[in-house]
Amino acid sequence: MDQARDDIWAIEHRHSVRRFTGEAVPADVRAELERAVAAANATSGLHMQLTWDEPEAFKTMLAHYGKFQNACNYLALVGPKGPDLDEPCGYFGEKIVLLAQRLGLNSCWVGGTFSRKRTRCDVGAGEKGGR
């Protein structure tokens, strides 16, 4: 029941943030998020990837238009190509977003205001990014 209560708290307190402090995410927080992504990937068959300290993906005109500032950490939602990819990406991606909120990190879902070519994520043959 504590997990459900924690999730409700995170849902109530979560809001989109586009301006970040630029401070490094603490190692223990990174490790907990990495563990959660690995567990979600094992359960879902996705290939989600966390990238740390990489500002290039958000150095675009669209990111400037979207008012992103100091965005250099991100979760790439990647999985097997197919018509049903968006559902697991949304479900498991939101689980990671809520964990990040509980760990004191704000976030924002991003669709088209970043450069796919500039990301450090690995999209293999037969995979694509979720929307």
Question: Can you name each region flagged by the protein language model?
Answer:
Residues 1-131:
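Acidic, surface-exposed loops and disordered segments
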